[in-house]
UniProtKB/Swiss-Prot annotation:
It comes from the Bacteria. This is Aspartyl/glutamyl-tRNA(Asn/Gln) amidotransferase subunit B. The keyword Lyase does not apply. One of its GO terms (biological process) is glutaminyl-tRNAGln biosynthesis via transamidation. One of its GO terms (molecular function) is ATP binding. Belongs to the GatB/GatE family. GatB subfamily. It catalyses: L-glutamyl-tRNA(Gln) + L-glutamine + ATP + H2O = L-glutaminyl-tRNA(Gln) + L-glutamate + ADP + phosphate + H(+); L-aspartyl-tRNA(Asn) + L-glutamine + ATP + H2O = L-asparaginyl-tRNA(Asn) + L-glutamate + ADP + phosphate + 2 H(+). It comes from Borreliella burgdorferi (strain ATCC 35210 / DSM 4680 / CIP 102532 / B31). SUPFAM superfamilies: GatB/YqeY motif, Glutamine synthetase/guanido kinase. Keywords: ATP-binding, Ligase, Nucleotide-binding, Protein biosynthesis. Its EC number is 6.3.5.-. Heterotrimer of A, B and C subunits. InterPro entries: Asn/Gln-tRNA_amidoTrfase_suB/E, Asn/Gln-tRNA_Trfase_suB/E_cat, Asn/Gln_amidotransferase, Asn/Gln_tRNA_amidoTrase-B-like, GatB, GatB_Yqey_C_2, Gln-tRNA_amidoTrfase_suB_CS, Gln_synth/guanido_kin_cat_dom.
Length: 485
């Protein structure tokens, strides 16, 4: 018996537009409950929606970035269902004619790049948010501030075959939306939400069977998504062994994931398309988008995306996979590196400093590179001092620390503290000879093969120079001098 895990993702991205999808209310997170609502948000009689053009523009950008075909006619539909946080009794969405279809993304896997197809991207409005009191089973509240917020829903094909691949796809998609400034994609505040559809293809006695699809909800982190998939894979294997349930006999159902117990719990049978009673939104006309408009949006706003940036960085600067993945995870960090490397003679060393020292500071302080107090050129200058042998790597960390404290360049710190290394071979030779004259016993120990004698003499050399001598040159000259004694 063989099992193949099959996963499809439904991702809701709340766009960072100034106003909501179909009205002029502010589109912001949080705030006083029900303070950003209007008759359109609340579905009051007589209210008429109007399309936020930036919603369409955002969908065009997302479609182009995911290699999707963009439709020239936009049609909105009503999706009917009842829930307390949906005041109209329907959601304005898109059913049979989504704005984008047939896209794809490449993800990195241990066996190399893998193409994950995207079935569709469509526009819709968000619902309100239900709040249930922990100390009461009888009281719930609804905040409609989120009602009508602009969403894009991205539906992947069932091309994903592991929890790691699902996380890789979501990470790649999130990077794209952040690069394009379409959304913060913050799972904690709900601007990036994902439902996971999981089932198995079971091959038994030469016959393939599909297990019932479980749509898993309540997933608030990539860690939860991976854990839910791995649990569901095992659960469905056991269910098949015990009950032989198939997709044809049982259909699709919804399950919730409990972070604390790490298990999925059945919630309800999944609605079908007919249950939603879709029909065209009568209050919104068809909107025609010609190719020139689509091209104009692409040309105005589209930038180099992470996947392409990684390829370029590896070829241009010879950086490792780890380096380019980390640098491109944040477009502002990538920009910082690109500015720092412009006048650098050693791009790899610049990358190392940014990925170690700079990122360490950012993480410790909980700030972004936009809030960092050192200009990219300051890192370039510091690295050039190291490359030129004017300061040691150890000294560079001391310099960097003072640069951080004062917000000044490396040259200022080095000049004021007279920290520049002595690299003059004649000067170094004189100090080496002095140390040899003062330590004849160490010379004898060295000739007997005692390695610690070299370390002792190097220590004396550094002491005489107050730590300012170039240690690499000093070591070379010391060994050369010892060979002549």
């Amino acid at each position: 018996m063989e099992y193949k895990l099959v996963i499809g993702l439904e991702i809701h991205v709340q766009l960072g537009l100034k106003t909501k999808a179909f009205c002029g209310c502010k589109n912001e997170f949080g705030g006083v409950p029900n303070s950003r609502v209007c008759p359109i948000c609340l579905g009051l009689p007589g209210s008429l929606p109007s399309v936020n053009v930036e919603l369409i523009n955002s969908a065009i950008l997302a479609g182009h970035a995911t290699n999707s075909k963009i439709r020239n006619v936009v049609k909105f539909d009503r999706k009917h269902y009842y829930y307390p946080d949906l005041p109209k009794g329907y959601q304005i969405s898109q059913n049979d004619k989504p704005i984008c279809e047939g896209g794809s993304l490449l993800i990195e896997t241990p066996s190399g790049p893998k193409k994950i197809n995207i079935i569709r991207i469509h526009m819709e409005e968000d619902s309100g948010k239900s709040l249930h009191l922990l100390d009461s089973e009888n009281q719930s509240y609804v905040d409609f501030n989120r009602s009508g917020a602009p969403l894009l829903e991205i539906v992947s094909a069932p091309d994903i075959n592991s929890g790691d691949e699902a996380v890789a796809f979501l990470s790649s998609l999130r990077e794209i939306f952040r690069y394009l400034d379409l959304s913060e994609c913050n799972m904690e505040n709900g601007s990036f939400r994902c439902d996971v559809n999981v089932n198995l293809i079971v091959k038994e006695n030469g016959v393939e069977h599909k297990t019932p699809i479980a749509e898993i909800k309540n997933l608030n982190s990539f860690k939860s998504i991976k854990a839910a998939i791995e649990y569901e894979e095992l659960r469905q294997q056991q269910e098949w062994i015990q009950f032989k349930k198939t997709l044809n006999s049982c259909g699709k159902h919804t399950r919730g994931f409990d972070d604390r117990s790490g298990v999925t719990v059945i919630q309800r049978n999944k609605e079908t398309v007919s249950d939603y009673r879709y029909f065209q939104e009568p209050d919104l006309p068809l909107i025609e988008i010609d190719d020139s408009y689509i091209d104009n949006i692409k040309n105005l706003k589209l930038i180099e995306l992470p996947f392409h940036a990684r390829i370029r960085l590896k070829g241009q600067y010879g950086l490792s996979d780890f380096d380019v993945i980390t640098l491109t995870a944040d477009k502002h960090l990538l920009k910082y590196f690109e500015e720092a490397v412009i006048n650098s003679s050693d791009p790899k060393k610049v990358a190392n400093w940014i990925l170690s020292e700079v990122l360490s500071v950012l993480n410790d302080k909980g700030i972004s590179v936009l809030e960092f107090n050192l200009l990219p050129s300051y890192i370039t200058e510091l690295v050039e001092f190291i490359v030129a042998g004017k300061i040691s790597g150890k000294m560079a960390k001391r310099v960097f620390s003072e640069m951080m404290t004062r917000g000044v360049s490396a040259s200022v710190v080095i000049s004021e503290n007279q920290l520049e290394q002595v690299s003059d071979k004649f000067v170094i030779k004189q100090i080496v000879l002095e140390v040899l004259d003062e330590n004849p016993k160490s010379i004898e120990l060295y000739k007997k093969g005692k390695d610690h004698a070299i370390k002792f003499m190097m220590g004396q050399i550094m002491k005489k120079s107050s730590g300012k001598i170039n240690p690499i040159l000093a070591n070379e000259i010391l060994l050369e001098s010892l060979s002549n004694v």
